[in-house]
Amino acid sequence: MEDYVYKTKPYAHQADVLKVSWDKVNWAYFLEMGTGKSKVCIDNAGILYECGEIDTFIVIAPKGVYRIWAEIEIPTHMPDRLNAEVVRWRPNPPAALKTALMSLAEPAEGFRVLIMNVEALSTKKGQRFLASVLRASKALLAIDESTTIKSPRASR
């Protein structure tokens, strides 16, 4: 982890959280809103990829938030050298996106990032797709805005 070169320099609190959490199997970032949890999570994924621990980074977020990961957070904080293929879930994708999505259900050749909206997990199609990606990869799974799935009895 000490050799990891960040794309955007972390603030002290972000570096501290990452230092204690980067190699944990299960972890939650209980930081205040606006303190850079997304950046910490992206850095964590980058570190784990460079250490050979993961080949796929999966982000589950609410519909209004998941596009921000693909369009802003990942491009801003994920180091270019990782050459991550970022794919955003769509239930009825055009042909080119369908090919990219289906490739996620195969063993990885490089670093992949899947961004899914949490609402997709309320559908059999979304559940089956995520399960196929998880079976084919060594993944870090991150849940943004986890209050949407906080109850064990929730349909998601």
Model-derived regions: residue spans:
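SF2 helicase/translocase NTPase motor core
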Residues: M1-L31, T35-R156
